[in-house]
């Protein structure tokens, strides 16, 4: 698994926002979204719930997040 994707996941969860995580990491919001979609494809299940108010871990994401 790509360490850049894991770092992006950690930032998105910590900041609660793809936009803020992308700004912090120097990516576009669209690029970070693509990274998260790719990460979810890699692991085979959704790890984030996306909403207008931000992002948070799914129950499955909560189980794997400590490994990040």
Question: Can you say where each PLM-predicted feature lies in the sequence?
Answer:
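Helix-turn-helix DNA-binding elements, focusing on the entry/boundary residues of the two helices
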Residues: 17-18, 36, 50
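Short helix-boundary/capping micro-motifs
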Residues: 11-26
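The N-cap/first-turn positions of alpha helices
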Residues: 2-5, 29, 61, 68
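Core residues of bacterial helix-turn-helix
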Residues: 24-25, 36, 43, 64
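Short glycine/serine/threonine-biased micro-segments
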Residues: 14, 28-29, 52, 59
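Short alpha-helical "packing" element that flanks the helix-turn-helix/winged-helix DNA-binding module
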Residues: 8-12, 64
């Amino acid at each position: 698994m790509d360490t850049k994707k894991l770092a992006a996941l950690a930032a998105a969860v910590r900041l609660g926002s793809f936009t803020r995580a992308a700004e912090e990491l120097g990516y576009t919001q669209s690029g970070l979204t693509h990274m998260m979609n790719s990460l979810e494809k890699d692991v085979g299940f959704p790890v984030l719930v996306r909403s207008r108010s931000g992002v948070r871990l799914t129950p499955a994401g909560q189980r794997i997040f400590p490994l990040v």
